[in-house]
Amino acid sequence: MKKTLYTLFVLLLTAGLLSWQWEKTQHPALDKGEVIECLNMETQQAYQIEASQSKFAQMHLAPIQVNPANLLGKIVPFNAADGKTGQAYFIPAKKKSDKWLIVIQEWWGLNDHIKMEADQYFKDLGDVNVMAVDMYDGKIAATPDSAMKLMRGADMNRMVALIQGAIKHAGPKASIYSVGWCFGGMWSLQTAILAGPQAKGSVMYYGRPESNMDKLKSIQCDIIGFFGNLDQSPSPAMVNDFEANMKLAGKNLTAYKYEAGHGFANPSNPSFNAAAKADSYAKAIAFLKAH
């Protein structure tokens, strides 16, 4: 009997110690903003999976080589949110400005075409700092196969840290705008989500839309998007769903659709559509100036 009571006492004591240790090692609860930010990476992961397949690569012809004569910006370092250093192609405003345009590359990387786009936005917008974030940390692809390999090895958490670092680099009083194409179009929308109340306007060119309603509801700025009816990434059906989800979330999305395929706005793309590029660019500039 004594042996039984002793055994029972040991079991109860052990259970109590385990329970105390469990409570001691639990992490504090995340607030709603942190939950939205760190969970629900489905959109980025879905893009990474899709962009790692040959079918996606076939939609992207190797970019035409461009040789810019006099670029306006230079590569500068900044602190990413993961404690590591990031880099960006940066053009400071001619006069001190709290307006920042974050430019995000296509899946090729921060190549000369993106730098030229950053220069053009700087010229046409005027009073703005332009920061084209290097999402691949110095790597650039010249062929669909090499871009596909870069995407397969991409760390989406690192990319979130780069965007967060760029926003912090701009400063707490900065008004954050964003623009990107394809891979960058997806990240332009994610930038608006990550920037929270600092976000003032986001331009997305044929980027994968966000479908998570909590993330869509967290958006605090207007969105303008340009899509191709002949595109399959995102497909017209995905764009229609995006419009419906944004409406359901109570957010303002203006979507323009062109009879064009994927990458229609890239002059270095052999399937470039000049008319769609000109119209969408004029609308993008007007949108950014109005916000």
Model regions and ranges:
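Alpha/beta-hydrolase fold nucleophile elbow
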Residues: G171-W181
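Short alpha-helix in the alpha/beta-hydrolase fold that links the catalytic acid
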Residues: E117, S235-N245
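Short beta-strand/loop motif that positions the catalytic acidic residue
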Residues: I219, G225-F227
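Serine-hydrolase catalytic machinery in alpha/beta-hydrolase-like enzymes
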Residues: T25-F56, L61-A69, I75-A170
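C-terminal catalytic histidine-bearing segment of alpha/beta-hydrolase fold enzymes
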Residues: A249-H291
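Acidic catalytic loop of the alpha/beta-hydrolase fold
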Residues: L230-P234
